[in-house]
Each structure stands twice: as structure tokens, then as C-alpha cells.
UniProtKB/Swiss-Prot annotation:
The gene is tgt. One of its GO terms (molecular function) is metal ion binding. The active site is at residues 94, 268. This is Queuine tRNA-ribosyltransferase. Its EC number is 2.4.2.29. Keywords: Glycosyltransferase, Metal-binding, Queuosine biosynthesis, Transferase, tRNA processing, Zinc. Catalyzes the base-exchange of a guanine (G) residue with the queuine precursor 7-aminomethyl-7-deazaguanine (PreQ1) at position 34 (anticodon wobble position) in tRNAs with GU(N) anticodons (tRNA-Asp, -Asn, -His and -Tyr). Catalysis occurs through a double-displacement mechanism. The nucleophile active site attacks the C1' of nucleotide 34 to detach the guanine base from the RNA, forming a covalent enzyme-RNA intermediate. The proton acceptor active site deprotonates the incoming PreQ1, allowing a nucleophilic attack on the C1' of the ribose to form the product. It comes from Thermoanaerobacter pseudethanolicus (strain ATCC 33223 / 39E) (Clostridium thermohydrosulfuricum).
Amino acid sequence: MAAIKYRLIKKDSRTNARLGILETPHGIIETPVFMPVGTQATVKSMTPEELKEIGATIILSNTYHLYLRPGHKIIEKAGGLHKFMNWDRAILTDSGGFQVFSLNSLRKITEDGVEFRSHIDGSRHFFTPEKVIEIQNALGSDIMMSFDECAPYPADYDYVKKSMELTIKWAERGKRAHKNTEKQALFGIVQGGTYEDLRKECAQRLVDMDFPGYSIGGLSVGEPKNVMYDIVDLTTEYLPEDKPRYLMGVGSPDDLIEGVIRGVDMFDCVLPTRIARNGTVFTSKGKLIVRDAPYAEDFSPLDEECDCYTCRNYSRAYIRHLFKANEILAARLATIHNLYFLIKLMERIREAIRQDRLLEFKKQFFKKYGYKEEY
């Protein structure tokens, strides 16, 4: 028995957008889907009950951070990540590759794996593809990621080629080490920087290994948006239709719509929660910095068109006051709204695909939000 099952329900007639159902050991997910990020086994400031109320069906957690603190063995003793954090819906864990490679001066890469120093206390650690699988097996997530090297942008061709080869070797090793295939699905991660031939080669070689799903990694790391979209377009072309596709670390409203148009099913990003804590919210008419002075006497909701808990109950003036007073509730209310906005956006995208109106929906959304239709 496979851990997950993807069913393609409908394809958009004018784009590569797909409507699907992803069955996991912890529930059914309608795709395309946005996954809130709970790095430390918590989506910052939100309870699991609140996440359910806003419609989250799957969240993401982070292997690197949970390995360092509290430790995967402790989470395993607790009965796995779902029990530990009291979340009974699906969880996806990333491999920690992106975090380890972000450490730069604190890490050293070999073919065996990566030696790195903890950002918490400077202690030395060594991640191999097998170790990363062992950690994720202990966490018990529904969907796991292979260990990959995330090349920086820009990077020269030879470096990215070596990096891609390493990612493929590590994917093979990780797949061999994965013990719990009936309850946890392991995705391969397509790398290759912004080089089209490397992306194509990496995708084809990973597809030959027959993973239950595929991630597109190494994007949204500083490259221009049109380059990212071109690479996504090219990559999805080489991925099987009957498996889910996940674009890692992408979550602004325009990127979600553009990603779906190019055949992506799953997205995650810290953006909505991070900007919420800084007093910035998404609205149907674009971003709004609620802590700014003009909102001191604005008693309207964050977004007139939103029916989230925050917009039903609180005004811009009140939320601005909370931010100015450094009250914890400010971040909570803004986070609830931002996550609800993106989850609702995905719902509207799915409905647009159902009705074959995705391009019309994009046009209307972009115009109202203030995006230029460049792509």
C-alpha cells in the first residue's frame, strides 16, 4: 500500500493547471493547496484548532530545526509529530537541506553529506541522506523530502551541475534508506538552478526512480520572477501527470496563481506569517501596512471582502493600536487573516479551474490587487 494517492480530477483547458485530490494517512487534501509553515512544530501564534477553522488541511514542519530542538528522538517518544503538536491532519516535512545550505560559513559539503554547526549553540552535526530519512521517519510526517543541495543564485554552470548530481545521488540513497513507505511518502526534489538542461536532466532521472511525488526546489532564492516561472514551466513538463508536484518556498498571491497555471499542486511559504508579525496584511486590493499612521482612525476591517475571524470582529484602528503597543494579539490577528486569505485564494483558484475560468480569474485578481500582468 502506498502512503499517498493522487487523483487528477480535471485539467484546465487553456493552461497546465490541475484540480486534484491527494489522499494521505491523515486526511484528504484538495489541490492546488497552500501549506502554512510550522517550522518548530507550531505555525507561529496559531493553535491547531485555529488552523482547522481557517481551512488548513496540511502544514509543513522543518527537519533541521526539530532535529536540533527538541530532538527527533523526543518527538518519536511522544508518538510522532502529529501527537506531539496535537495536529491530526497531514504534515509535510522538508529535508533541512535549504536551512543547512543557508548556513554558508558554518557548513562543509562532501559526497557523504554535510557537516554543519548548529545556529543555536555552535555544536557540530553531520547530515547524510540516510540520517535525514531516519529523522523524518522518527517524526512520522505524511510526506517527507529527500536531502538535496540547494544551489545559490546566481551560481555558475559547473557548480550547479555538480550540485544536481549530488542531489540525485542523495535521492537514491535516501530512497534506499526509507523504511516506512506504507505510511510516509518520500518526494524527490528537482534541482538544477536556472539551467534548463540541468532541470530537465534532474527531473527525468528522478522520475526514473519512481518517487510518489516531486518537488521543485532551488527557486525563489533571488532569481527574477520571469526566470522562476520559466523554470517551473519547463520542469512540470517532465513530471508525471499522476503524481503531485510541489513548488518549495513560494507563497505570494501572484506566485501561487502563476505556479498553478504552470501545473503545480502544492506550495508553502513563511511569507504570510512573517509579514503578519511585522504588521503587513494581504487584502483583495493589495498589501496593507496596518501599523502605518493613516489607519489610526480607520474603523473598517482589514479587508471588506474577507470573512475571517479577524475581519468579522476587529478594525484596522484596533489592530494598529495592538501593533503600536507591542501586544501579542496583533501578530495573532494578522496571522489568522493572512493565512485565511491565501487558503481562500486557493479555494477560489480551484473553483476557477473547475469552471475553466482560471485566466479570467487571474486577470480580475491581478487588476484589483495591483499586480501587472507581465507573465
